[in-house]
Amino acid sequence: MTAYEHITTGTGEECGVFGAYDMDGRDVAASIYYGLFALQHRGQESCGIAVTDTFGQRKVLSRKGLGLVNEVFDEEELAKLKGNLGVGHVRYSTAGGTRVENAQPLVINYVKGTLAIAHNGNLVNAVELRHELEYTGAIFQTTIDSEVIAYHIARERLNTKTAEEAVKNAMKKIRGAYALVVSSPRKMIGARDPFGLKPLCIGKRENTYFLASESCAIAAVDAEFVRDVQPGEIVTITKDGIASDMSMALPEEQHARCIFEYIYFARTDSTIDGVNVYHARILAGKALAESYPVDADLVVGVPDSGLVAAKGYSERSGIPYGMAFHKNSYVGRTFIKPKQSDRESSVKIKIGRASCRERV
């Protein structure tokens, strides 16, 4: 394996990102914690929070670790994270390896200040860009393509007036599926890839703005869902409100949502690009019943992701819906384990077969 192959093994990163900016100066670490807790299904390998105080010295404080959100953070740790602007991340990797150095958010200190970046997605040209950066003197501390994005944003910031311009220029160089939440002094920036493959949405609670991978995380902090960030859109949140830049957007016919968000990754109580995930799975089950009718006594879903689709299949086919599998609730999501061997062993202890005499 070369120095570059390890960042492209597998399909990339299906993570969860969350950002919060309280214009009145209240600490946001607890809100980010609850937002990440609501996004835990998107990543169980590591997590992190980085915050800054926009009214003070603007020093970035961060805490990252391997494990679930409630394993890495407790009240004492959250109390140390003083700041009214911050970003958070939960990670599931199929690339880059399980090590704390690969946990996000990434905090970059450079001549213009400090950036904290949380990234969900995968770059198809990560190896090429990383190679170019290393040959110009860049030294990488991680094996994830998120650091490639961070380097490009930091370098572009040297030649731009604003951080959002730097994000836009970086987007012109990177290719792939991504959603970004970036904090810089006194502003929070969200960006979505031009195809709209990875979700990102905006929420608001009183004078606090939020960015999140899914709307369920907005609801978890008692905020109001404002809207989705559009494919190719860059949103900049400051004390003056939300500014939008659509110059990277593609025509709507070129948008390409990730179907796996609706099938597996997203929570059923989330709505992505105007489509409720629960409803999408019901419709998928009905479509399957129309395309592939069967002679059976019972329709059974494999918990948890297959349960709603099975209900849709039952409704359309007229075959009763029932349970034939027992799920061990103490085992996490199995598909997002980093290794195939881990997934196989986890499935064995996660799913038990109930006694069932019907044809399923």
Predicted segments with their positions:
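Conserved short alpha-helical segments that host acidic/polar catalytic motifs at enzyme active sites
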Residues: 1-231, 236-296, 302
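Secondary-structure transition/capping motifs at alpha-helix termini
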Residues: 138, 159-160, 293-297, 315-324, ...
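Amphipathic alpha-helical
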Residues: 148-161, 311-333
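A short acidic (Asp/Glu
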Residues: 192-193, 309-312
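Glycine-rich phosphate-binding loops at beta-strand->alpha-helix junctions
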Residues: 300-309
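Short, glycine/charge-rich flexible loops or terminal/linker lids adjacent to PRPP-binding catalytic cores
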Residues: 318-359
